Design a protein with these regions (language model features):
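Short beta-strand(s) of the beta-wing in winged-helix/HTH DNA-binding folds
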Residues: 25, 54-55
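Canonical helix-turn-helix DNA-binding module
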Residues: 35-46, 63-65
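Glycine-rich phosphate-binding loop and adjoining helix at the ATP-binding site
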Residues: 29, 105, 112-205
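Conserved phosphate-binding catalytic cores of ATP/NTP-utilizing and phosphoryl-transfer enzymes
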Residues: 55-79, 185-205
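Basic amphipathic alpha-helical segments that dock to polyanions
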Residues: 29, 40-53
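Gly/Thr-rich phosphate-binding beta-strand-loop-beta motif of the actin/hexokinase/Hsp70
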Residues: 66-105
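Extreme N-terminal segment that seeds HTH/winged-HTH DNA-binding domains in transcriptional regulators
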Residues: 1-26, 31
Length: 205
């Protein structure tokens, strides 16, 4: 179980590096993450097989010779991601490609979080429309939700804005959406977004 968790974390980190630094070689990924070249190669091969990552141009060989590195990049067309965010005064849902480019969206301004059941009902209906507009559920690789509050291991521990306490919102949404769902606090995901765009890559935590 522990090895599976380590591999999953490495997979996530490798995807993040490729997204932020593409085009990037396997060696560069290994050096940036301090993960063994063998582990990087194994995970990258799986990502290529799944269609999430593709190989592109060749780099220059080192001065000592040897094989030229092959650069990696995210395949934007490999799938879609459903994203949603709740903030203090508004909320939005959108469909993005794997590089975060927004394709379709809905926004909700000036609403009260006191009406969460009604809001979730509205979001559910609009989400179904967006999924259909994007070509169907089979095109999606997953969904991500950003919320204010305390989130741990994909579980909402406390969100006063949403009126949630120790809530397994992930399970509820996965059943509703029929796709993997990732939930985290808004502050963390904002920082992660900057990381992916390269603005904060040299900073950790």
């Amino acid at each position: 179980m522990k090895n599976s968790s380590v591999k999953q974390n490495n997979r996530s980190d490798i995807l993040s590096v490729i997204m932020a630094r593409q085009p990037v070689s396997r060696k560069q990924v290994s050096e940036l993450l301090e993960i063994s070249p063998a582990a990087v190669t194994n995970i990258v091969d799986e990502l290529i097989s799944s269609g999430l990552v593709v190989e592109g141009a060749f780099g220059e060989a080192s001065a000592r010779g040897g094989r030229r590195p092959i650069f990696l990049r995210i395949c934007e067309e490999a799938g879609l991601v459903l994203t949603a965010a709740f903030r203090l005064q508004d909320a939005w849902i959108s469909v993005c490609n794997l590089m975060g480019k927004e394709l379709f969206s809905r926004s909700y301004a000036d609403f009260s979080f006191d009406g969460m059941p009604r809001l979730f009902q509205t979001l559910s209906a609009d989400t179904a429309q967006l999924i259909e507009q994007a070509g169907g559920r089979e095109r999606f690789v997953g969904a991500g939700l950003s919320i204010p509050g305390t989130v741990e291991n994909n579980r909402v521990l406390y969100s006063p804005e949403l009126g949630l306490v120790d809530c397994d919102l992930t399970a509820v949404l996965q059943k509703e959406l029929q796709m993997p769902v990732y939930i985290d606090k808004d502050v963390y995901l904002n920082a992660l977004g900057e990381n992916w765009m390269g603005a904060g890559w040299d900073y950790s935590d």
